[in-house]
Curated annotation (Swiss-Prot):
Residues 1-60 form a transit peptide. The keyword Iron does not apply. Disruption phenotype: No visible phenotype under normal growth conditions. This is Lipid phosphate phosphatase epsilon 2, chloroplastic. The lineage of its organism: Eukaryota, Viridiplantae, Streptophyta, Embryophyta, Tracheophyta. The keyword Oxidoreductase does not apply. Inhibited by Mg(2+). It is a multi-pass membrane protein. Optimum pH is 7.0. Exhibits phosphatidate phosphatase (PAP) activity in vitro. May play a secondary role as PAP in plastids. Its main location: plastid.
């Protein structure tokens, strides 16, 4: 009987399960557990805090440095852009001004021969006498003298690529000086010495000097080439005018054959000059 009751007791499944909830655990056990864990691992928590604080400080410092570097680079790029824009605008303005100045001088240089030729033609038409015929011959012979001197001296131009022919003396300066001096002599002969004649003479000489200076500014001749051309043209014009008054005028007024000869030579010279203009001046203006 006792054996059977003990076997039933062993095989009997208990009706209640006893377990403690988290809230039912005594508080002193939890606090003790917390104290144990915190007392066991105090260094790890401090190290983690220090590591986090150091890494956080480093990351913040790196972030500040990166932002500062980016701000500095952005400001530097902005300054570079502003400097580039300002330099570009100033260079563009300088180029526009220089191009405008060079364009005006280039146009004036191309028109100079036409203006001087028109001035010379006007003087010849106003004179319409033997001195005008003599001046035509002198102008053409002055140009021939310039070509001969160029071949003899054979001095290169300042920029050989612009013109291949020699530059000493300047044929433009020599021709302009010849015509300017002859025009001044004609004005003084017509009007005498007064305020008007002096003003016109000064204007003619100033215009001729400006046109000769353009040959230097356009790098077609050196200063010495222009000065030599101006001196040769002025001296040749003076001698040509003096020769007319001292020698040719008397023979022209007294001898008909001299008049015919002078007229034919002047006509041939004018025709040759016209052919030269058609072959060279229009080609240079293109």
């Amino acid at each position: 009987m006792a054996a059977s009751s003990s076997s039933l007791l062993l095989l009997h499944k208990p009706t209640y399960n006893f377990h403690f909830a988290a809230s039912s655990v005594p508080t002193y056990i939890n606090s003790a557990r917390f104290r144990i864990s915190s007392s066991i691992f105090p260094l790890d928590r401090r190290r983690r805090r220090r590591i986090w604080s150091v890494s956080g400080f480093k990351s913040m410092a790196d972030l500040v440095k990166t932002n500062a570097r980016r701000d500095g680079e952005d400001r530097f790029q902005a300054l570079e852009q502003e400097a580039f824009i300002s330099n570009s605008s100033s260079e563009l303005q300088n180029e526009l001004v220089s191009d405008a100045g060079d364009g005006i001088e280039a146009i004036a240089n191309r028109l100079s021969k036409w203006i001087v030729a028109a001035l010379f033609g006007s003087v010849l038409l106003l004179r319409h006498d033997g001195a005008a015929l003599w001046a035509v011959i002198g102008s053409v012979s002055n140009s021939v003298l310039s070509v001969a001197l160029k071949r003899i001296l054979n001095q290169e131009r300042p920029v050989a690529t612009l013109r291949s022919d020699p530059g000493m003396p300047s044929s433009h300066a020599q021709s302009i000086s010849f015509i300017s001096v002859f025009s001044v002599f004609s004005v003084m002969e017509w009007l005498g010495t007064n305020v008007l004649s002096l003003f016109l003479s000064g204007f003619i000489l100033a215009l001729g000097s400006y046109f000769t200076w353009l040959r230097v500014s356009q790098k077609l001749h050196t200063t010495s080439q222009v000065v030599v051309g101006a001196i040769v043209g002025s001296v040749y014009s003076t001698l040509w005018y003096v020769t007319w008054n001292s020698l040719v005028l008397e023979a022209f007024t007294s001898t008909f054959s001299v008049q015919i000869a002078l007229f034919l030579v002047a006509a041939a010279s004018a025709l040759g000059f016209a052919v030269y203009v058609l072959l060279n001046w229009f080609k240079d203006d293109r």
